[in-house]
Amino acid sequence: MLFVPKKTKYSKSFKGRIKGQTKGGSELAFGSCGLKALEPCRLTSKQIESARRSISRSLRRVGKVWIRVFCHLPVSKKPVDVRMGKGKGSIEMWVCRVQPGRVLFEIGGVSSVLAREALRKASAKLPMRCSYIEDGLR
């Protein structure tokens, strides 16, 4: 189950840059604890799915997991051994830009110790530094 949009207005996009802190999505909205990004990064749908599977295995079907990011930016790539020019390449993967301070995953309905361990394992699957946050702690 990869996280890609069903329909987009434009098929390809510019690369862009990730500047500044996140404007929204920096606090917990659903669960009692979560995983917050500390560095800017482009997360792929495969990385998000890998982290989600890691959390699900750690929790053993107890509690609930919310994914707070969605991949909506296409990344194009030209094939190997193709010369420059002749248009932009085809879509290789989908990514989302993550700014520092953004909550990536939330967990509810489990103990704090189990949630911390599950999110620690999930953060190992992600290409950036993350921190554990709780409802009372910021």
Curated annotation (Swiss-Prot):
Species, as recorded: Anaplasma marginale (strain St. Maries)
Pfam families: Ribosomal_L16 (PF00252)
CDD domains reported for this sequence: Ribosomal_L16_L10e (cd01433)
Self-association and partners: Part of the 50S ribosomal subunit.
Keyword Coiled coil in record: no
UniProt entry keywords in alphabetical sequence: Ribonucleoprotein, Ribosomal protein, RNA-binding, rRNA-binding, tRNA-binding
Biological function: Binds 23S rRNA and is also seen to make contacts with the A and possibly P site tRNAs.
The protein's name: Large ribosomal subunit protein uL16
Database matches in PROSITE patterns: RIBOSOMAL_L16_2
Single Gene Ontology MF annotation: rRNA binding
Domain of life: Bacteria
GO biological process, one term: translation
GO CC field: cytosolic large ribosomal subunit
Family annotation (InterPro entries): Ribosomal_uL16, Ribosomal_uL16_bact-type, Ribosomal_uL16_CS, Ribosomal_uL16_dom, Ribosomal_uL16_sf
Entry similarity comment: Belongs to the universal ribosomal protein uL16 family.
Gene name per UniProt: rplP
NCBIfam families named in the record: rplP_bact
